[in-house]
Amino acid sequence: MLGIIFEVSRSDAHVTFHWGLNWIRQVLPASLYEEFGHDRELWSLIQKILRSEVLLTDGTEQSRERPQDQKTQKDWYSGKKKQHTLKTQILATSDGLEIVDAIAGVPGPTADINLFREQQPRLHPEQECMGDKAYIGAERMTTPHKKLKKKELTEEQREENKVISGKRIFIEHLMCRLKVFRILSHQFRLNSRRYRTVMLAICGLFRFKLGRIDFTIYDC
């Protein structure tokens, strides 16, 4: 498509696309942690600031091409989606307007709670978070009440679930904004090894669009 629009060869379009993608990754940090995590003193300050709110977390899966060998097929097959998928998990502020941390390109069957436990050490030890039922059992995590077998939720539990849902809507909006990019709205057709780069580049563009990154500091 780039070749048709700009009248360049397929190989030139390929090189230009991947050059631009890598450039975006270099200048637009995908998350607060990627931007400031290397500075222990500054990140410690940011942790204390984030501690004043409840962070939101959510995961999303995107279909990918079917791997050729059977072992790889099994590793990437999501029973939930009934297809081979790539998973991304986002940790965001309570208003859904800043990405605190992002993990992208892991196999779809990877449990959301395991990804959160991987991210948790980067947060303040007392940081409170909120997620859906996939995160039940995680420390310092508020989740909806899960209906037990042959037992209905109480009225109080249903009301609490509504409150949690109302607060989690902001990270759902964030996910929708990321999926505005068409490359995330259907099967990922590039080499799956490029998915992490693509996803994190889009996270960087999202942060830049909302003014979270001072682009003027880069010498471009």
Report the location of each language-model feature:
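Short, well-ordered secondary-structure "scaffold" segments embedded in the functional core
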Residues: M1-R25, A30-C220
